[in-house]
Amino acid sequence: MAFRRTEGMSMIQALAMTVAEIPVFLYTTFGQSAFSQLRLTPGLRKVLFATALGTVALALAAHQLKRRRRKKKQVGPEMGGEQLGTVPMPILMARKVPSVKKGCSSRRVQSPSSKSNDTLSGISSIEPSKHSGSSHSLASMVVVNSSSPTAACSGSWEARGMEESVPTTDGSAESLYVQGMELFEEALQKWEQALSVGQRGDGGSTPTPGDSLQNPDTASEALSEPESQRREFAEKLESLLHRAYHLQEEFGSTFPSDSMLLDLERTLMLPLTEGSLRLRADDEDSLTSEDSFFSATEIFESLQIGEYPLPLSRPAAAYEEALQLVKEGRVPCRTLRTELLGCYSDQDFLAKLHCVRQAFEGLLEERSNQIFFGEVGRQMVTGLMTKAEKSPKGFLESYEEMLSYALRPETWATTRLELEGRGVACMSFFDIVLDFILMDAFEDLENPPSSVLAVLRNRWLSDSFKETALATACWSVLKAKRRLLMVPDGFISHFYSVSEHVSPVLAFGFLGPKPQLSEVCAFFKHQIVQYLRDMFDLDNVRYTSVPALAEDILQLSRRRSEILLGYLGAPVASSIGLNGPLPRENGPLEELQ
């Protein structure tokens, strides 16, 4: 063999010579006598020649590809070390993603038409304040970390190239999502600025007679531009902002405001209190100053028990006494609603809660107020069921049974034990009706089970099937809870009977595919929450004394009920009575007030 000739030759030449000498080796080994007996046809000779030639070509190609692979492995680490200190660019970009997220949530941009007070996530009000990040993109971060002198001028293009080369993994998808949200928030800022500039231009562009006399050319130019076009552009821009806010609500944390209520009041021309007008004026003035938000935050954080950095807007003797009770730990509470009701701190919420409890206790001592609150609850739920095209007959029967049970003095002790087992700290109207029943129901609707969402989001199922499945799920849950009751025929059992009629309607309204019913339920929830927020606002109600607070709460309740019942198309609860006068014995009656 000719394997000895490989010294001083390349591997390819040695392999070619070896393959070429195979026929000679076979001929010399087996002798000419063996090959002389073979009779090869011309076709067989061609096949053998083609096979030998293909084998040689395949061996050469495999060897050449193997050499190229080795060169790539050697060049890869050298290129990575020359660019960013032996750290590949995709890794740096992946490490920068968390910082971008922090930047997105570090600032807030306030809408020029509303304020951010509310923290409910289920209300379909327009979100005025959005988390907006820095105006710099990820490409600027790459430029900062680059040591090349030309990186500053070509950073954005290099970043785009690197983004295209990054494989579509979970990390890159997350970074692309963050970049998209960042750009979307920047677009929101630009649209908000355009809207505010347009509003300022409309407000200050009205020409006066003096201006027209002094500058007739400019006056004619201002009048030449059609006013309708500017208004149409402003309306389109505002509609675009509203749609963008709703889109951002679906993919991020929301901070809904009470702008829906203010717009409704402006449309219906309902009277506003002096406190709400003053708050609105303060909000409009604060839009021109970015420092006002931070200064207000510092003032709120500095509020402590027994210390008042700034004097209150009005005297609040009852509130100050309640703060002392909170300091002593004598105000129990089941759930803190500090953020939901817009309170400055937990101590502020507890002090106002104590005053509200006392105010409701005084209100419910009068027969007329008992009739009013009982009838408002009946008419609100009846209006909701009517809007949902459901018969309220079953609800009215269960509601009457629950009221008759709650008004019997012999049931109050059992009711107290049942509610204390559920964590209710005080037997008051606020703790039982507003907090335990309404607020807990809204919280449950904000976090529905995944199985329910899967059914409601299935596009292949009809709306009637979804509604039936949701109602069946609600009934099965209530039936299972009824089996675990401590008192089989107590207050909670009667409440479950009412919930069997109301829960499916509310659940399908908040979670279902019908936009009209969803709007009605969202408005209902928004009105209830705003009613509680106004009740816990020192500027809307008087905390000077318990009777004054009770009077303001009653007026606030009448005003909110008129708005809500008017929207639902239900009659206002003014002169319709309950099932008879309440007993006025001392002791047990106070437990339910």
Swiss-Prot record:
* InterPro entries, sorted: Miga
State the annotated membrane topology for this chain: Multi-pass membrane protein
Question: Pfam families attached here?
Answer: Miga
Modified residue annotations for Phosphoserine = S132, S220, S224, S228, S276, S295
Q: Where in the cell is it found?
A: Mitochondrion outer membrane
**Residue ranges of region Disordered?**
98-134, 150-171, 197-229
Q: How does inactivating the gene affect the organism?
A: Mitochondrial fragmentation: mitochondria become round and show loss of cristae. Female mice show decreased quality of oocytes. Mice lacking both Miga1 and Miga2 show strongly reduced quality of oocytes and are subfertile.
Phosphothreonine is found on T206, T273
Q: Which domain of life is it from?
A: Eukaryota
Give the protein's recorded name: Mitoguardin 2
Protein species of origin: Mus musculus (Mouse)
- Gene field: Miga2
